[in-house]
Regions:
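C-terminal charged capping/lid subdomain of soluble metabolic enzymes
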Residues: 183-185, 277-352
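Short glycine/serine/threonine-rich phosphate/pyrophosphate-binding segments
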Residues: 106-113, 134-135, 246
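A glycine/threonine-rich phosphate-anchoring loop and its flanking beta-alpha core
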Residues: 15, 113-202
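ATP/NTP phosphate-donor binding region
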Residues: 1-97
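Solvent-exposed alpha-helices and their adjacent loops that cap or buttress functional pockets
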Residues: 31, 92-94, 117-118, 146-147, ...
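Generic secondary-structure signature for well-ordered alpha-helical cores
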Residues: 93, 159-163, 168-169, 175, ...
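Active-site segments that bind and position negatively charged phosphate/pyrophosphate groups
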Residues: 198-304
Length: 352
């Protein structure tokens, strides 16, 4: 078992091991004790792993029940969030209680935000079941729900008590969902390591899962420890997200998060080339790797359709939008621009 420790405002461990789901109750009990708990999951994940985690927690002495909701970004809203709160209240979960998030990024966001706000905060544990959530969204304590105006506009920072990553569960993922998570993996390489980028180019991701998980989680851990509340260095993790979130929202979330981030990274890198921040070969190598991982690289919407969404993004501060701009593979820089210049960057990124 690989353990990665996160020294945040609430320190916790991320445990990586094949088959750890069967011992979930035992591992959670070590950290949280065995008390009352609610497992929050999505309807596609629960039939696969719900009973395993539920029985494991019952065997460890937990008084545990479950709540499931329809999968997909469309469920990441205030209505479903309220349903989770009502489920907690109906089960009389106290401040000593626990929420377990079993699922992908949407589940982690929803369960985490409920944990942050129910009774002004209770503990929660992340059991991510997608590549995207294992390498990214389950690490760092960001929780949120969407509004019609955009993604993640209502949320809180809430560090988990424990994260359990089981690489075995990724074997059940259909290729589109698996490769969707690879966008965040490639993002990590673009941010921090040319060598890791080359590893991704040479070897199939399914053949190096543990290596991918350990690199991406450790990279994000380092950034979170430096800037837990996203005021400086952590903004780097938004590479591809400023424009990507706009693409995702413009599609009414029919374009998945990873695919949107892939498009967003290409847009930002193309703009960086045109504005002299990096060389053309950086863009060429990025596009080639994304295509190898079956990820989209073309901008599906005009700049006019994306503009207002970018300006209302949660990363916009007043009249300033901070862009994460590649300089080379393994290094990016923060570039603050005025909101009036967003259209120019969108156009430079390939949005007509």
């Amino acid at each position: 078992m690989k353990t990665i420790h996160v020294a945040a405002s609430r320190s916790y461990d991320i445990l990586i091991e094949r088959g750890i789901l069967t011992r979930a109750g035992e591992e959670i009990k070590k950290v949280c004790g065995a008390g009352e708990a609610l497992i929050v999951s999505e309807d596609t994940v629960w039939p696969l792993y719900g009973e395993t985690v539920l029985c494991s927690m019952q065997d460890a002495g937990f008084d545990v029940t479950s709540f499931t909701f329809p999968h997909g970004e469309q469920s990441k809203n205030l209505s479903v969030y309220a349903e989770i709160l009502n489920a907690l209240a109906a089960r009389h979960i106290s401040r000593k209680g626990l929420i377990v998030a079993l699922g992908g990024g949407v589940t982690g966001d929803m369960a985490g935000f409920a944990a942050a706000t129910y009774l002004r905060g209770i503990r929660f544990v992340q059991i991510p079941t997608t590549l995207l959530s294992q390498v990214d969204s389950s690490v760092g304590g960001k929780t949120a729900v969407d509004l019609p105006a955009g993604k993640n506009l209502v949320g809180a920072f809430c560090q988990p008590s424990l994260v359990l990553c089981d690489p075995h569960v990724l074997s059940t993922l259909p290729d589109p969902i698996f490769y969707d998570g690879c966008a965040e993996v490639i993002k990590a390489a673009m941010l921090k390591s040319h060598t890791f980028f080359e590893d991704l180019d040479k070897t199939s991701p399914r053949e190096q899962l543990e290596h991918i998980l350990e690199f991406c989680i450790a990279m994000k851990r380092d950034v979170v420890e430096e800037d837990e509340f996203d005021t400086g260095a952590r903004q780097m993790l938004n590479l591809g997200h400023t424009f990507g979130h706009a693409v995702e929202a413009a599609s009414n979330f029919s374009i998945s998060h990873g695919c949107a981030v892939s498009i967003g990274m290409v847009m930002m890198t193309r703009a960086a080339v045109k504005k002299g921040y990096c060389k053309e070969d950086v863009l060429e190598q990025l596009i080639a790797l994304l295509k190898k991982y079956h990820l989209p690289t073309e901008v599906p919407y005009p700049a006019s359709e994306l503009l207002d969404i970018v300006r209302s993004d949660k990363k916009t501060m007043g009249s300033t939008v901070t862009l994460i701009v590649p300089e080379k593979i393994g290094r990016c820089t923060l570039v603050p621009i005025q909101a009036v210049d967003v259209l120019d960057w969108l156009t430079a990124g390939g949005a007509e």
